[in-house]
Amino acid sequence: QGGAPWNPIPP
C-alpha cells in the first residue's frame, strides 16, 4: 500500500 495515515501498513 504505502504509508498513508489511513493505511500505516508498509508496502
Curated annotation (Swiss-Prot):
Its main location: secreted. One of its GO terms (cellular component) is extracellular region. The modification Pyrrolidone carboxylic acid is found at residue 1. It comes from the Eukaryota. Signal peptide: none annotated. Expressed by the venom gland. Keywords: Hypotensive agent, Metalloenzyme inhibitor, Metalloprotease inhibitor, Protease inhibitor, Pyrrolidone carboxylic acid, Secreted, Toxin. GO terms for biological process: regulation of blood pressure. It is found in: Secreted. GO terms for molecular function: peptidase inhibitor activity; toxin activity. This peptide both inhibits the activity of the angiotensin-converting enzyme (ACE) and enhances the action of bradykinin by inhibiting the peptidases that inactivate it. It acts as an indirect hypotensive agent. Belongs to the bradykinin-potentiating peptide family. This is Bradykinin-potentiating peptide 11b. It comes from Crotalus viridis viridis (Prairie rattlesnake).
